[in-house]
Every structure is written in C-alpha cells, then in structure tokens.
Amino acid sequence: MAHLATVVLLLVAAARQAPLAAGDHSANPRLPTCAAAPDVAAPQEHGDGGGVGGGRRILDITHAVRAELPVLGSCDGVGALVRLKKSMANGSRSNLSELRMSVHTGTHVDAPGHMWQPHFDAGLDVDTLDLGLLNGPALLVDVPRHSNVTAEVMESLNIPRGVRRVLFRTMNTDKRLMWQKESDLSFVGFTEDGAQWLVGYTDIKLVGVDYLSVASYEHMIPAHVVFLKSKEIVIVEALKLDDVEPGMYMLHCLPLRLAGAEGSPVRCILIK
C-alpha cells in the first residue's frame, strides 16, 4: 500500500498535461478526410460502474460494440456488426444473432504478430498473451494535451520504476474521438522515440491508450514495431477513459481465446 501511495503522489505531481478494415495498420495510405463531426455528447452506455462491496467500485472502460464505432480510413463507422439470424417474432424457437467484425474493432488488444511477421509465423497469437499482464495494478496518467507521447513527454510523466501497467489518457478523450464515427487522423499517440523510451527506461509491460492506435498516424508502423517486436509489451487500444480520475486501480482485461488471431476484442474494467 505504501508503494501505491507513493505512485499516486508522484502522479499528482506530474503535469496533466477504399477504407481500411478496422484496426488495419499495415500501411499508411492517403485516407479520406471526413467532414467535421458535430460536437455531440457521448451516448449513455449501460454498466459503466457499480459497487463490488467493501467500498470498491467497478469502472467499465470498454466501448460498447456499436455500428457508430470509428474505423481508421472510413467516414461511416464500422457499420452493423450484429445481425439477428433467427427471430422468435418471425416464428423461430429462439433468437439467434451473428457477430462479424475485425478483431481490432473498438476496445481491443494487439498480439505480437500484429505488425511483426516473425512473431506471427511463430504462432504468437492472442491466445499466447500473458493474462498476468492483463490483470493487476495499473496507473492512469494524463498526457500533456495537444502532444503525442514522445520521449520527452514520457520522461516528464515521472512514472516510477516498478509500475508495469499504464493507461495513457490524451486529448483523444477530450475530443471524444471514439464517440465519432468519422475517422480523425489528428489523433495523438506514441511516436517512435516515445515507444523506445518506454521500452528502454521503464518497467511498463502493458500500454493502454484511448484511441484505435497506440501510435500516432505519422508513426503508425515504427512505434507499433518497437512495442510488438519486444514480445514483452501488451497493447490495449481504444479504452474508454472518460470521467476516470488519474491514479492507481486494479485493471482486469480479458481477450477472447482466438487461436491464430493477431488481436482480439477485450472487456476491460478498473476496480477502485
């Protein structure tokens, strides 16, 4: 507990500073520019929080799977993902839905093979991810606004050694980019040197971010490769960090056991 208190104090001292398939970061083609999205309030989602006893509270930081979720390279969102194949209203004995979507839709994890072919060939799929890294104490920090996560920014955050899981909240949350179906390539994320600084000078093994890519658009490939080539970093993208206070939490993220897949939708919660 003393260690967690120290981390929280350090955090307070730190400054606040044709369309691709969902999650397809394999190249950086010229993507369509969408019209400016209206400034609308985020729709209400069910199950955003609740008591778990003992004064603790569950915070759901997973975006609901909905047709309006953004996808890089599209102005129209991901579209309908769930289709009712059988309906009791039409005489079937049960209601039966079908789900079809990219494994990088909405809140999801990247496996090492996502952008490093040798790891894909070696079978380092989402089913090989370390659940121990996806569950445990995590630190939520605020990145200086209007800034990518560069090496300089990483150093300024003063994240203590020993912290293994960090969720980075950026201006993407302020701009409510995950609530807009239009792709917005002005999102911020890690630069290559920021990723290198994290790998070289911290003990962080889980990196969580608040938009579809851990890397900024300009650094899409190189920053991903820095993380994924190491095999030791787990990336969680498109987290819903609205209205969550900075500090220490217990993080629980569980991806699907998709054998052979380089990513998976994931349900992530924080317990305070």
Swiss-Prot record:
Any keyword Secreted?
Answer: yes
User: Among the entry's GO cellular component annotations, what is one?
Assistant: extracellular region
Q: What is its main location?
A: secreted
The keyword Signal belongs to this UniProt entry's keyword annotation: yes
Q: In which tissues is it expressed?
A: Highly expressed in leaf sheaths and flag leaves. Expressed in roots, stems, leaf collars, glumes, young panicles and pistils.
Its family remark reads: Belongs to the Cyclase 1 superfamily.
Name under which the protein is recorded: Cyclase-like protein 2
The protein's gene is named CYL2
